[in-house]
């Protein structure tokens, strides 16, 4: 069994989601018999490990759920360099979402240090996080994408009125979001010019680029892709897609992570042909971006044609997340999924 450090938390708006993901990963890895070291990345940039672990409590001792919860209430931060020099882990399992945890930053940090990690590499992480660049790659690979525009803060500051007029050409409703973001934390459904002007000003208070995209009415589905080695060969498989029935106007943050916020139906209630097509396109998106290990792509099916929305390189791994739901529907345990992710991370570091 391996010594595995689990990174979760982070400074992004998805901090709370990542904590839930980290807890799920730690518990699952522990049931697999691995030695688990939970590492909380705080919102202010600190790196925290359970206090008793840092005074040489064995790996196994920090796997108690009670100790885990109690110790994170009274931890002290450690510097990144002190932490890395004493990491003593075979691989880092990334349970981060959004921001520097998913945009290639932490991946680059670990790569420079020569520390193996799970999930996609630097380039794929950065491309997938940049919604505009990702859409351009999807279009080049032949995928259908709803019309969109990107706006930079400088252009908006110089001419707010022209920016609003440009985005109005997409029609209403439209979806406005930061170019680099995930989990629909800052995604807004815009229905009129006044709302568009107001939300642009608000988003640019904290983000440098935004993207707005035309609304598509249809069936929303999400499809996970897993990589694994079988008989010495790497293979990619698409999981059964999940149909998303939002409790609100769209599948926003509340719908994704609040109990009862949405209905998630796995497998999706779509035709066999549509399911096959969605799975093919999910693998295509995974491959086009250069993802590794796993990913999850979201689509809207309009008139039988899937239109891709985005690809997540570090999809959620909470109790209610879609990848665990889809793996279960495919007869694959999360222990199998995690074992494959670890194997791929270790093999890639060797190459």
Swiss-Prot record:
GO biological process, one term: cell wall organization
Main subcellular location: cytoplasm
Cofactors demanded by this protein: Mg(2+); Mn(2+)
Keywords: ATP-binding, Cell shape, Cell wall biogenesis/degradation, Cytoplasm, Ligase, Magnesium, Manganese, Metal-binding, Nucleotide-binding, Peptidoglycan synthesis
Catalytic activity: 2 D-alanine + ATP = D-alanyl-D-alanine + ADP + phosphate + H(+)
Subcellular location: Cytoplasm
Chain sites annotated for binding Mg(2+) 2: 310, 312
Binding site for ATP: 167-222
Involved pathway(s): Cell wall biogenesis; peptidoglycan biosynthesis
Listed transmembrane segments: none
EC number: 6.3.2.4
GO terms of molecular function: ATP binding; D-alanine-D-alanine ligase activity; metal ion binding
Record carries keyword Cell division: no
A Gene Ontology term for the protein's cellular component: cytoplasm
Binding site for Mg(2+) 1: 298, 310
Similarity annotation: Belongs to the D-alanine--D-alanine ligase family.
Protein name, UniProt field: D-alanine--D-alanine ligase
Gene transcribed to yield this protein: ddl
């Amino acid at each position: 069994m391996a010594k595995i450090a689990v990174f979760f938390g982070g400074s992004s708006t998805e901090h709370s989601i990542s904590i839930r993901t980290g807890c799920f990963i730690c518990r699952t890895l522990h049931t697999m018999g691995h030695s688990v070291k939970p590492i909380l990345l705080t919102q202010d940039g600190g790196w925290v490990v359970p206090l008793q672990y840092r005074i040489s409590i064995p790996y196994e001792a920090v796997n108690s759920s009670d100790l885990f919860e109690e110790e994170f209430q009274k931890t002290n931060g450690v510097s990144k360099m002190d932490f890395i020099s004493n990491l003593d882990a075979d691989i880092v399992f990334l349970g981060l979402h959004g921001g520097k945890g998913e945009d290639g930053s932490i991946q680059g940090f670990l790569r420079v240090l020569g520390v193996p990690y799970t999930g996609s590499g630097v380039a794929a992480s950065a491309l997938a996080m940049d919604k505009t660049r990702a859409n351009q790659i999807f279009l080049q690979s032949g995928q259908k994408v709803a019309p969109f525009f990107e706006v930079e803060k400088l252009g908006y500051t110089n001419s707010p009125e022209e920016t609003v007029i440009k985005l109005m050409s997409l029609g209403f409703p439209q979806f406005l979001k930061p170019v680099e973001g995930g989990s629909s934390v800052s995604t807004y459904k815009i229905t009129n010019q006044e709302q568009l002007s107001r939300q642009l000003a608000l988003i640019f208070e904290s983000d440098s680029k935004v993207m707005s995209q035309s609304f598509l009415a249809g069936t929303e589905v999400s499809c996970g892709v897993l990589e694994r080695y079988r008989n010495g060969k790497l293979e990619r498989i698409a999981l059964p897609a999940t149909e998303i029935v939002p409790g609100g106007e769209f599948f926003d943050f509340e719908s994704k992570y609040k109990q009862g916020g949405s209905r998630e139906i796995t497998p999706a209630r779509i035709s066999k042909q549509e399911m096959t097509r969605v799975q093919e396109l999910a693998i295509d998106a995974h491959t086009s971006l250069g993802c590794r290990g796993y990913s999850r792509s979201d689509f809207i099916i309009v008139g039988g044609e899937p239109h891709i929305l985005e690809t997540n390189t570090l999809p959620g791994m909470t109790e209610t997340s879609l990848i665990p739901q889809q793996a279960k529907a495919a007869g694959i345990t999360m222990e199998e999924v995690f074992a494959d992710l670890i194997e791929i991370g270790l093999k890639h570091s060797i190459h």
